[in-house]
Amino acid sequence: MKRHPFLPRREFLRAGMTLAAATLAPSTVLAQTELLTRPVPSTGVRLPIVGIGTNRFRSGDPAWTARLRDTLATFARLGGKVVDTAPSYGDSERTIGAILGETGLRDRLFLATKVDRDAIDDGRRRLEASFAALGTARLDLVQLHNLRGAGTLLPLLR
């Protein structure tokens, strides 16, 4: 019988069986029972320290949108909560709004967006457009994007 110079048959079989058995074991990556969280200072609500950014959550062909929907559903199923978006991320707010409407995930997520206008009226319109695009009456967090208009927009956000 000819022997392979690098891996004897017995070791090859042992490695193959070990690999096969490993696929039957629960994944340790997904086995984590609880995400690391921190409390929001003003409310005490605990949120995971890691969220999902949605700059690339833009509409495309139906297959791409299905992948985005699956990604967001998996994120929520594994305990993710914070979803961060912005009007400047193309049509990501509209895409996320459609996905939230289809999946019913809105109440399970902490939805954050941004505003970045110099004038208060422009900022108000930008926020109203975000509410409409996201298909929600509630935003959990509104951030100043790049601090643009901070002096005029802070009163609006309060």
Segments (PLM) and residue ranges:
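N-terminal binding-site loop/beta-alpha segment at the start of enzyme catalytic domains
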Residues: 2-109
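Conserved beta-strand positions
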Residues: 52, 85, 113, 141-144
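Residue-level recognition of the N-termini of beta-strands and the immediately preceding loop/turn
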Residues: 108-110, 139-140
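Residues at the C-termini of beta-strands that transition into short coil/loop
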Residues: 16, 115, 145
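Glycine/proline-rich, positively charged
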Residues: 61, 118-158
